[in-house]
């Protein structure tokens, strides 16, 4: 699967293209979620509103306080089914509130374990194949 780099909505530097992909989240199939590929992140981080829209109950999930990207947020973990380019996988996602970003983060344990990813910054392209 090949994806072009994209502008990240809500950022001050809209002239930069970033490695971001549209992920279909189980429970909200008609609204693909823009996700930044974050090789430095261990976990997937999504806005908590995504869990609510997907019908995921976080009331019994343990909560952690996390500092990242210049803000502090409360995160609760739950498994989430996701699809990218026809490949579906289930991985843990930390749903965060507040979440001031207009995109989500895909990290090592929730994304990169499942895919072979080649970032081609010179041509603003991401080449992704599922791990077999």
Where are the predicted features?
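Pepsin/retropepsin-fold aspartyl endopeptidases
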Residues: 1-132
């Amino acid at each position: 699967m090949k994806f072009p780099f994209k502008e990240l909505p809500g950022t001050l530097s809209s002239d930069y293209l970033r490695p971001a992909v549209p992920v279909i989240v189980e429970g909200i199939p008609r609204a693909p979620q823009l996700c930044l590929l974050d090789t430095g992140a261990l976990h997937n981080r999504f806005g908590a509103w995504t869990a609510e829209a997907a019908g995921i109950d976080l009331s019994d999930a343990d909560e952690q306080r996390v500092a990242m990207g210049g803000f502090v947020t409360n995160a609760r973990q739950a498994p989430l089914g996701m699809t990218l380019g026809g490949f579906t996988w289930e991985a843990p996602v930390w749903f965060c509130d507040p979440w001031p970003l207009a995109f989500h983060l895909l990290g090592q344990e929730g994304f990169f374990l499942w895919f072979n990813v080649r970032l081609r910054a010179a041509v603003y392209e991401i080449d992704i194949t599922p791990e077999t």
